[in-house]
């Protein structure tokens, strides 16, 4: 059978009926833009839906409903201090998210963030943007060397074999049962009309 993958907001976890319908339709994975465990960072990015209730509980609800969770995370918000790397790691471990896509914040053109940073004179001239493998294209409040080192250390700690497999096993323990999928029933008496 065909399986599906989608991206959704965290408030999907509040819709048990939709989670059930998705798993019955063979949705396997959902990507969530969690961004940060920091309330200040979530307010800064206007991710107000991520402030309602526990993000860890939301992830666990989706896992228990039968959906694998992948998460997107960002470091380098103005409100971030040097504790953000530890807090991101602890959150990802507690939530049992094996696939955590972590990047450093970029100010993409034509966004409110880009306009604000341009007005503040914080954009670096002639910088490229658009991927999560580059250093930020603006002057961050956290010293750049601290941000880059913290980011590299975070990735190294998240993707050490021991840490990764511990999260993977924990997510399997939380993952809810799914109904077996049956192949579509097709009639074999189809005729091609010419």
Question: What would you call each of these model-derived segments?
Answer:
Residues 3-191:
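A structural motif corresponding to the C-terminal lobe/cap of the Radical SAM core domain
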